[in-house]
Amino acid sequence: SYLMNIGEVKNKGVELEISSTNIQTKDFSWNTTFNISHNKNKIVTLDGMQTEIKSGSQIRKVGKSYRTFYMIEFAGINPETGAPQFYTNDVDENGNYIKDITEEINKAHAIVLDKHAEPNAIGGLSNTLRYKWFDLNFMFSYQFGGYSYDNWAQKTEHGGNDLEANIPSYYKDSWKKPGDVTKYELFYEKPSVAMNKVTTTRRLHSTDFIRLKTLTFGFTVPKDWTRKIGIENVRLYASANNLWTWAAYDYYDPEAVSGGTAIWGTPPLKTVTFGINVNF
């Protein structure tokens, strides 16, 4: 086997950056920079007569984004029985999906979803403030409009099918008695539908996030002091990365996702650094 190009993808986008000096006085200044970018891609052609190629939880389909999701639609848990439910998504004579609900997984059909891994917008917001000898800089990064499939969960959301495997902590909220409204099925040995063997939209999550990416506070020693000992400039600082994050889905880090799939990725680490800059 060998790698080769089997299609054409068209990308187009726009990027905007705005910088401003909000305040500027002798002793105090405040500067802001905001940027946002949007990129959209679309598969134009595939090899030969092909119009689509299915690949796990995604599909390469002409006219769609490169990482468009393709899977069975989860329809919740039956509140009376605790069994998982799915939309059948049969197609009527007009080409529309029929949203009947079934507990039989073999009657549910995977469909092309209007969701993709690529975010609609990414960007950042940074501010720098200075007052006499002190400076403060902080930057937020953000991302909106993308999705990821939780492959970690597919390995552990077995509902009792594998009693020797790890179990996610959220299974404590699984169905237990008639009337319970929950996203997680009755947990018992050898269930009729082993959810770890089924790719469904229950594990499809937004990757929207806002993160305090960097925060730095510094103090520059007045030159009247440093020049007395033959030093031109001394700056002390403390810097931190990834101190705070808001995420639409917070069970895993949205930046630990690769290609629309959450599996084995390492999230950005929280770090704190102290330092000194000296110029002679």
Protein language model features and the residues they cover:
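Membrane-embedded beta-strand positions of outer-membrane beta-barrel proteins
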Residues: 32-34, 138, 236-238, 276
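Extracytoplasmic gating/loop element in the C-terminal half of outer-membrane beta-barrel translocons
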Residues: 143-236, 240
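Transmembrane beta-strands of outer-membrane beta-barrel pores
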Residues: 20-22, 36-42, 131-133, 142-146, ...
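Outer-membrane beta-barrel and related beta-rich outer-membrane complex signature
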Residues: 30, 41-57, 145-175, 246-254
